Every structure is written in C-alpha cells, then in structure tokens.
A protein has these predicted regions:
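Functionally critical loop-and-helix segments that line ligand-binding/catalytic clefts
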Residues: 2-19, 153-262
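Substrate-binding cleft of extracellular glycoside hydrolase catalytic domains
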Residues: 3-133
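Short, solvent-exposed polar/charged micro-motifs at secondary-structure junctions
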Residues: 26, 110, 146-147, 204-206
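Positions that flank functional sites
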Residues: 45, 75, 141-142, 202
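Alpha-helix initiation/capping motif
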Residues: 50, 139-140, 213, 220
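Noncatalytic linker/hinge segments flanking ATPase motor cores
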Residues: 59-60, 77-78, 110-111, 138-145, ...
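Intrinsically disordered, low-complexity segments enriched in small/polar residues
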Residues: 68, 135-137, 219
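Catalytic domains of cell-wall/extracellular-matrix polysaccharide-remodeling enzymes
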Residues: 98-182
Length: 262
C-alpha cells in the first residue's frame, strides 16, 4: 500500500470521490495532502442511500474541501428524475450544486436513445429541485459503446461537464506526471472537465482507509471555485473583512443554510 498526495499539476486541481467503502479517518490530512474537492456517493437508484454520505460531507467540508454528491444510476429501476431527487434527499441539507450522474452500467438491451433519455430526465429532476447544474460521469468504454451514436445528437447532455473515468492500469498504482498523460477520447465532448484516473489498486489517499478514486479537475483553483458557483478568493463578505481560500465555502454554507456543518 502506497500513499500519494495531490499531484498539483499546473492547470489542474486534485479531487476525490468517496462512498461507504472508504473510511475518512482524518479529513484534515486529506486537505493537507492537497485535495481541494470531493464528491460523496449519495444514492443508488430509487431506494438506496449511502449510510455515510452526510458524515462524509460534514467531515470533508469542515476540513476545507469543496463538496458535492453523486447518484449511481440504476436505469432498470426507471424514474430518472426521481433518482435525481433521491440523491438530494439522501444528501440532506447539504451543499448540492454540481450533483453528478454516475451512468456506467445498463442492461444489454438498453440502446443509446433510451440511455440518453434517462440522462436528460435525470438532469431535469435536478432542475425541478433547483439543485443547480449537474455533471455527467461515465467510463470511456461505456461512452463509446453504449451512449453512441445518440449522445452526439443530444445538445443538452453535451453541454454538461464531462467527468470521464479511464485508468491506465487496474492492477498497479499509476498517476499522470504531465498533461500528455491526460489525453482521452471524449467525443462528442470537446474534452473532459474532470478525469478519474485511479481507483481500486491505485495510490492511497492520506487520511482515508481503503482504495479511493482520484480525480483531476481541468482548471485552476479560481476555476474550481467558479465551477461550483463560489466567489473568487479575497471576496469581501457582509460579515466584514476579506476571506481567503476555502473559508469562502464555510461562509457561504452558513449563509445559505445548506449544510449541517457545526
């Protein structure tokens, strides 16, 4: 088992995603290792809530990470808009912008039209709840083999930021060392916004017990704040003074009453 902190590649931000499989034993260590954002699994299909989602959100946000949640789609259960609302319900009164649709599996008889319809209705469910713009997560192989050809015709879906999962190895630890290691086939998207480059058998994340998915966000920290609808560093707030870094997040969470953070 080998631990590795954030990559800190120029022009990128490091992030993680977690579920009940991981134990976040030291959230401060996660932040000190350089990770800036996290997605916690909220739900799976219509009936399942991850039992640790709210604890993960509370712990990671208190350490200074920007947080959101993801919903693992179970397309055979139908009702995609309700699956979106289930994720929000499981997350509770927490910061919910950039909720992620995790669409990576489906019965073999589901075609690309049916899958794209599901995805569009999921994001519509987020819109109905005022949850902000969502993010589309999938694997390269699922994108190419299951979502094509219909995805190329779905302007609304292509407008969603793409969180692409593609690993160089499933058996040994690997991490990119330069931007040339990050090129992926993303059509019909111009490029990925987030890349999950490591999961099981990857490098361990400081402060977390168990394999943990590692991600890169394309952009600077200022871009990451803007992505989540947060103001730039140094923004003056009504309470007085100038706030810096992730202090912005705590202030906004308090003012919007979006989370049980203390």
């Amino acid at each position: 088992m080998s631990f590795l902190g954030a990559l800190n590649l120029t022009g990128f931000c490091d992030a993680i995603d977690v579920s009940k499989v991981q134990r976040v034993v030291d959230p401060d260590a996660v932040r000190k290792a350089g990770f800036l954002a996290a997605w916690a699994k909220a739900s799976e299909g219509l009936g399942y809530c991850d039992p640790l989602v709210q604890q993960h959100l509370k712990d990671l946000s208190s350490a200074g990470l920007i947080i959101s949640v993801y919903a693992f789609a179970r397309v055979q259960q139908g009702n995609p808009s309700e699956q979106a609302k289930k994720a929000l319900s499981c997350a509770g009164n927490t910061y919910q912008t950039r909720v992620m649709l995790d669409l990576e599996s489906a019965p073999k008889d589901w075609g690309s039209v049916q899958l794209c319809d599901f995805a569009e209705e999921f994001f519509q469910g987020l819109d109905e709840e005022g949850a902000g713009d969502g993010t589309f997560y999938t694997y390269t192989s699922f994108l190419q083999e299951r979502l094509h050809p219909e995805i190329a015709r779905r302007v609304k879906l292509i407008a969603k930021p793409l969180h692409l999962a593609e690993y160089k190895s499933l058996t040994t630890s690997w991490a990119p060392t330069s931007s040339s290691d990050l090129r992926r086939h993303t059509g019909p998207w111009k490029d990925w916004t987030l890349l999950q480059y490591s999961g099981n058998a990857g490098y361990q994340v400081p402060g977390i017990v168990g394999d943990c998915d590692r991600n890169l966000f394309r952009g600077t920290y200022a871009d990451l704040l803007a992505f989540f609808g947060l103001p730039p560093e140094g923004t003056e707030v009504d309470q007085g003074g100038i706030i810096h870094g992730t202090d912005i997040i705590d202030d906004l969470l308090d003012s919007r009453k979006l989370g049980p953070f203390g």
